Amino acid sequence: MANKLFLVCAALALCFILTNASVYRTVVEFDEDDASNPIGPIQKCQKEFQQDQHLRACQRWMRKQMWQGRGGGPSLDDEFDMEDDIENPQRRQLLQKCCSELRQEEPVCVCPTLRQAAKAVRFQGQQHQPEQVRKIYQAAKYLPNICKIQQVGVCPFQIPSIPSYY
């Protein structure tokens, strides 16, 4: 009798464990399905950027950062000197608008869309000098940190190296 009772309890415990594992696996599979996209998250971000031209204020801010340093202003080296943006109300407002645009992006899309925005700035209008291209991409790289987007911080993309022709 004790053996039968033990077997029944063991069978019930096994059923309980299998049911629990099955439910857990279903939840994990559901989360994975929800997070994935048939075209992939990076391609989705690029497609959205191209369709809607996201981050217009960020592109304008990057353009201003590219020209910063001429005429005695601060330049972008390894860190940003934000004094000009704080003292100049127009630049401060533009940066705030850019940060607002970035906060509307999905965290997974922040860096890919910033890279697309930097690329758009780089190829708009005139041909830029290597130092200007570096400033564009450096501005894009650090924008999530400047805007205090904690899920992102600093974008991990490399700043393209442009050969100097002079």
From Swiss-Prot:
Residues 1-21 form the signal peptide. SUPFAM superfamilies: Bifunctional inhibitor/lipid-transfer protein/seed storage 2S albumin. Residues 22-37, 73-88 form a propeptide. InterPro entries: Bifun_inhib/LTP/seed_sf (IPR036312), Bifunc_inhib/LTP/seed_store (IPR016140), Napin/2SS/CON (IPR000617). Coiled coil: none annotated. The keyword Signal applies. It comes from the Eukaryota. This is a 2S seed storage protein. The mature protein consists of a small and a large chain linked by disulfide bonds. Belongs to the 2S seed storage albumins family. This is 2S seed storage protein 4.
